[in-house]
Amino acid sequence: MEAELFHAGARAAEWLRPLIRRAGGPLRCENVVVLGEVPGVRHRDLFAWPHWALKNLYGPVGIMVGKFHEGEEETARGGEPVPAAPVSFLPVRAAVRRRDPAFLHATPGLAVALASAEDDGRDVFAHVPHDWQELRAWTKRLRRPERPSTGSETTWASRSWPGS
């Protein structure tokens, strides 16, 4: 399921890249939605690896990838409650270079890359392996933010990844 989620996110990002440069482009967004349950896997865990890989691949070309989990309540930076998502989804959209880096405070290198991003048409997969398992291994080597995982004593950086 992770492979399909990653593939759908990459397709959404590639679909958006040429559209963002057109009129109204910065307002475009594609949502990759997961409906139903995956036996034995929480959506939070299912989204973790594909989300991290997509952020690192597409942030440097100005694409922001987020993640929201069904029913999860969050608080905005200003302290206001954010309505719970009705479904789990990955929003894939044009980055707002002045504001989005603030969402990446736990990964300063990625924040800098997003703030200065310019889509020059590069192949974001040119420098990464194309084999699925090798791509997962490449992603695991990227610096992950050190923050507690919800409901767990481990950090997100040290957690075990499904299928690894």
Residue ranges and their predicted role:
Residues 1-164:
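Expand to "…catalyze enediolate/carbanion chemistry for C-C bond making/breaking, isomerization
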